[in-house]
């Protein structure tokens, strides 16, 4: 029992260290004379995290363990998905993680895809596994996400990982919400007792962001201790404005260009833009990537702001790499085994 307790304690400390980001906080300053917000470079923060992962990977391999391996399943030929997958495999190579991309046609049946996932789940060479979303309409995305083994689920979409996150337990955190969390913590933006508005309630992004920010900072999986309001597509714009005007932190993950404008936020607020929208540039008539926030207008009033591109996007990829090394170390599996062992010992003693 003493050994089981020690291992469980060690596992908890490892995951809390990886997921809290508390050691990397910097002081939060809002200058009274600043004319514009500090633009947070997600690329620079992502490089910091990838350097940490790179060091962790090399230490893991130097200790006699096999190099971590990430398998990515890409269904169809969606250009955006192809670009995202390429970014992930490049990031894996940069931190010393082996990776493979398994290409399947859009015509693949749901059964065939589930069989492939099962095969990868049972492959001991595969540490991390993700299926790039979105999937063709004839395939149930929720069924696919739940088919991935929870301890290989580097996207953090499996219902077990979602449930553990909601219970403030250590789990594979969804990469984008975790990236937002790391931006906030590493920039030194305070959350304890602060008002936060999250625009967007998707189960993969908006909801987990709100969960990370409002939960108890003293729990197994530390949260932000903030007061969080979530808006969605049925929230009237004027009602949203009432909430954002009081918010210390505004996070937009709605997928609506110019949803958040300067008149909606208070002076010095931190604004995190998770939105990814492709629009036609009114000047060049070429495709342009923008977020949900009127960047030029809001940065004149906010204290901190993330750009699109170059903000949350690079952090998402970096957190995927973090999840992959966690998966390789079988941290969650070890914790689960110790819990089961403790239960078995308890039953035996009775």
Swiss-Prot record:
Compartments, as annotated in UniProt: Mitochondrion
Gene Ontology CC terms: mitochondrion
Glycyl lysine isopeptide (Lys-Gly) (interchain with G-Cter in SUMO2) cross-link, renumbered residues: 50
Essential cofactor(s): Mg(2+)
Transit peptide range per the UniProt entry: 1-35
InterPro entries assigned to the protein according to its UniProt record, in alphabetical order: Aminoacid_DH-like_N_sf (IPR046346), NAD(P)-bd_dom_sf (IPR036291), THF_DH/CycHdrlase (IPR000672), THF_DH/CycHdrlase_cat_dom (IPR020630), THF_DH/CycHdrlase_CS (IPR020867), THF_DH/CycHdrlase_NAD-bd_dom (IPR020631)
Binding-site positions, substrate: 84-88, 131-133, 309-313
Catalytic activity: (6R)-5,10-methylene-5,6,7,8-tetrahydrofolate + NAD(+) = (6R)-5,10-methenyltetrahydrofolate + NADH; (6R)-5,10-methenyltetrahydrofolate + H2O = (6R)-10-formyltetrahydrofolate + H(+)
Source organism, top-level taxon: Eukaryota
A Pfam match: THF_DHG_CYH
Enzyme nomenclature, EC number: 1.5.1.15, 3.5.4.9
Subunit structure: Homodimer.
Its biological purpose: Although its dehydrogenase activity is NAD-specific, it can also utilize NADP at a reduced efficiency.
Entry-linked HAMAP family: THF_DHG_CYH
Further facts: This NAD-dependent bifunctional enzyme has very different kinetic properties than the larger NADP-dependent trifunctional enzyme and is unique in that it requires formation of an enzyme-magnesium complex to allow binding of NAD.
Official protein name in the record: Bifunctional methylenetetrahydrofolate dehydrogenase/cyclohydrolase, mitochondrial
Native organism: Bos taurus (Bovine)
Native organism taxonomy: Eukaryota, Metazoa, Chordata, Craniata, Vertebrata
């Amino acid at each position: 029992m003493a050994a089981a307790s020690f291992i469980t304690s060690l596992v908890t400390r490892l995951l809390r260290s990886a997921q809290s980001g508390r050691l990397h906080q910097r002081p939060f300053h809002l200058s009274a004379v600043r004319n514009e917000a500090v633009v947070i470079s997600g690329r620079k923060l992502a490089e910091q995290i990838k350097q940490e992962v790179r060091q962790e990977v090399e230490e893991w391999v130097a200790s006699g363990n096999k190099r971590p391996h990430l398998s990515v399943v890409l269904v169809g030929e969606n250009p955006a998905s192809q670009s995202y997958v390429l970014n992930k495999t490049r990031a894996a190579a940069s931190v010393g993680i082996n990776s493979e991309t398994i290409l399947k046609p859009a015509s693949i049946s749901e059964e065939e895809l589930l069989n492939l996932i099962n095969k990868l789940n049972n492959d001991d060479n595969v540490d991390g596994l993700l299926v790039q979303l979105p999937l063709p309409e004839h395939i149930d995305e929720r069924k696919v996400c739940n088919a991935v083994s929870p301890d290989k689920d580097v996207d953090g979409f499996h219902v077990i990982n979602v449930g553990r996150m909601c219970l403030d337990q250590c789990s594979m955190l969804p990469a984008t919400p975790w990236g937002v969390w790391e931006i906030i913590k590493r920039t030194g933006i305070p959350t304890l007792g602060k008002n936060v508005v999250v625009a967007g309630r998707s189960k993969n992004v908006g909801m987990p962001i709100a969960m990370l920010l409002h939960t108890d900072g003293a729990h197994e999986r530390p949260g932000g201790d903030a007061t969080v309001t979530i808006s969605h597509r049925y929230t009237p714009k004027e009602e949203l404005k009432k909430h954002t005007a009081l918010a210390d932190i505004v996070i937009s993950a709605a997928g609506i260009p110019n949803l958040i404008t300067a008149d909606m936020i208070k002076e010095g607020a931190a604004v995190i833009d998770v939105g990814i929208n492709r629009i036609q540039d009114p000047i060049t008539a070429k495709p342009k990537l923008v977020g949900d926030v009127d960047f030029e207008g809001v940065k004149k009033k906010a204290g901190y702001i993330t750009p699109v591109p170059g903000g949350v996007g690079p952090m998402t990829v970096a957190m995927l790499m973090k999840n992959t090394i966690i998966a390789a170390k079988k941290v969650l599996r070890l914790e689960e085994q110790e819990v089961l062992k403790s239960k078995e010992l308890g039953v035996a003693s009775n």
